[in-house]
Amino acid sequence: MGRCSGRCTLVGICCLQLAAALQRQIFDFLGYQWAPILANFLHIMVVILGILGTLHYRSRYLILYSIWLALWVAWNAFIICFYLEVGHFSQHRDLIMNFNTSMHRSWWMENGPGCLVTPVRGPPLSLADHHMVTVTGCLLDYPYIEALSSALQIFLALFGFVYACYVSKVFMDEEDSFDFIGSYDSYGYQAPMKTSHLQLQPLYKPG
């Protein structure tokens, strides 16, 4: 019963991670954030692998899923520090998230709750991708939205890591017990002796 509840809980956590990652992937696509897009794609693949490992009793899949979650927590911690400019991180210094391919930063920058976007006239030779706008009236600035999204990812990843370790441990214990029982039976098994119903009688040679 405990194993079943652990498996069901882990599948539920993986489904929440999958939904959160897909939602995040959509907005990163809209904002041309190529580095998060690649990371989200890998995360979605590994989460699906974790679901398959849970349903099909594959402890190795869950171990790989747990290792990835540790990397996923580190990546999201970096995103939080990047957008909140913690330490030496600065979002205005290097366009890391889009590999410096455009001036886009985050979809939430111009589409956040309550944001009013006002176009600013730029140089006549400026490219369309480098348009200038002013954003005012936002109820929550986009760095905080991105940080909250990463915090949610970390929260789900921590729960997934704990349950993945627990379920994989249960799976490995069961595999060891099955191996032990199988080896014990193989040594203790003896083939039944076939009994013959023929009666042997002595032969007498005539004198």
Curated annotation (Swiss-Prot):
Membrane topology term: Multi-pass membrane protein
Subcellular location: Cell membrane
Protein name: Sodium/potassium-transporting ATPase subunit beta-1-interacting protein 1
Any one of the GO BP annotations: regulation of sodium ion transport
Gene Ontology annotations for the cellular component aspect, listed alphabetically: plasma membrane
Gene expressing this chain: nkain1
Pfam family membership, one: NKAIN
Residues carrying a glycan: 100
Similarity annotation: Belongs to the NKAIN family.
Summary of subunit composition and partner proteins: Interacts with atp1b1 C-terminus.
Lineage of producing organism: Eukaryota, Metazoa, Chordata, Craniata, Vertebrata
Organism whose genome encodes this protein: Xenopus laevis
Keywords, comma-separated and alphabetical: Cell membrane, Glycoprotein, Membrane, Transmembrane, Transmembrane helix
Residue spans crossing the bilayer: 2-22, 35-55, 62-82, 147-167
